[in-house]
């Protein structure tokens, strides 16, 4: 990656991360936040401006992680990628369209109230199409990428904030033929 953006037109590293990935096993993000109004503020901007930049504050890294390269591959390949959002007990999902690692140059009309440009940002996610879901559906339908066992996500959601890489839990295959 040579720029501070991950978009469909970026050159993709050959082999490795994300090669041959199907949408059913795609990598997604789950963001848990303590600000109970964050989703509503961002959803309102997305409805007005078509999409919204969702910031994740923290120290910026010099090189993309393996998982960021997977997300880059997915976006470039047109794989539907989701960001799941938990604030309190409310749960939503939105389509991920772009990742930016430098907030300079993003459209300020697509930033929600409360964005603090003085705080370090390790990434902004361009989100579109907010849908409501349930916490139960997320806990039962997603697994951590780092430990893909059913129910393993529940422990990771105990804190007030988290950025988790998740995948959809594959339904059990058909039973033996009779």
Roles of regions detected by a PLM:
Residues 1-78, 140-141, 146, 150-178:
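Compositionally biased, charged N-terminal/linker segments
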Residues 29-31, 83, 125-127:
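Hydrophobic beta-strand residues in large extracellular and virion-surface proteins
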Residues 53-54, 82, 122:
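A residue-identity detector for tryptophan
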Residues 57-58, 86, 126:
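Short, isolated positions within intrinsically disordered regulatory regions of eukaryotic proteins
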Residues 79-87:
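Short conserved beta-strand and strand-loop elements enriched in small hydrophobics
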Residues 89-177:
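Aromatic- and Lys/Arg-enriched surface recognition patch
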């Amino acid at each position: 990656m040579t720029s501070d953006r991950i978009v469909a037109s970026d050159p993709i590293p050959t082999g490795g991360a994300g090669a041959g990935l199907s949408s059913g096993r795609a990598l997604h993000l789950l963001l848990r936040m303590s600000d109970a109004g964050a989703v509503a503020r961002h959803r309102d901007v997305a409805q007005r401006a078509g999409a919204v930049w969702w910031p994740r504050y923290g120290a910026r890294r010099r090189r993309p992680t393996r998982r960021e390269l997977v997300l880059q591959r997915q976006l470039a390949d047109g794989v539907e990628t989701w960001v799941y959002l938990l604030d309190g007990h409310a749960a939503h999902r939105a389509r991920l369209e772009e990742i930016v690692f430098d907030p300079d140059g993003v459209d300020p009309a697509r930033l929600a109230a409360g964005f603090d440009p003085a705080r370090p940002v390790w990434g902004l996610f361009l989100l579109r199409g907010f849908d409501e879901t349930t916490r139960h559906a997320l806990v039962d339908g997603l697994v951590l990428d780092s430990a893909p066992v059913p129910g393993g996500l529940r422990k990771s959601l105990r804190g007030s904030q988290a950025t988790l890489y998740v995948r959809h839990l594959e339904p059990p295959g058909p039973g033996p033929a009779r």
